């Protein structure tokens, strides 16, 4: 009823996805970033605008979590505090 397939045929893939990271020379393992706020036991505050500048791009955009490494909870709080600092003119909306 069932064909007898040896284990080598069953495990190999024809589309080239098996062990793709070993074959791709550009593949790199990235060190997982840790949240700076969790490590230092602090919360983002709009009054610390020098520290908040680290989380803003040159154009004035808020950096995403995948780049900064902040946790979801602290990223939401960080965005609110940056917006408060912008509203109070401690941080610019747009950098030139």
Swiss-Prot record:
Q: Which family does it belong to?
A: Belongs to the bacterial ribosomal protein bS18 family.
Q: Looking at the record, which segments are called Disordered?
A: 1-25
The protein, known as: Small ribosomal subunit protein bS18
Q: Provide any one GO MF term from the record.
A: small ribosomal subunit rRNA binding
What's its job?
Binds as a heterodimer with protein bS6 to the central domain of the 16S rRNA, where it helps stabilize the platform of the 30S subunit.
Q: Enumerate the NCBIfam families for this protein.
A: S18
Q: Which InterPro entries match?
A: Ribosomal_bS18 (IPR001648), Ribosomal_bS18_CS (IPR018275), Ribosomal_bS18_sf (IPR036870)
Q: How does it assemble?
A: Part of the 30S ribosomal subunit. Forms a tight heterodimer with protein bS6.
Q: Which UniProt keywords apply?
A: Ribonucleoprotein, Ribosomal protein, RNA-binding, rRNA-binding
Instruction: Give the gene that encodes this protein.
Output: rpsR
């Amino acid at each position: 009823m069932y064909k007898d397939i040896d284990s080598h045929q069953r495990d190999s893939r024809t589309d080239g996805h098996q062990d793709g990271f070993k074959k791709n020379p550009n593949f790199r393992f990235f060190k997982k970033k840790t949240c700076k706020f969790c490590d230092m036991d602090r919360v983002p505050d709009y009054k610390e605008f020098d520290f908040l500048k680290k989380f803003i791009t040159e154009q004035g955009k808020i950096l995403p979590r995948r780049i900064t490494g902040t946790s979801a909870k602290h990223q939401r709080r960080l965005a609110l505090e940056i917006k408060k600092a912008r509203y109070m003119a401690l941080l610019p909306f747009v950098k030139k």
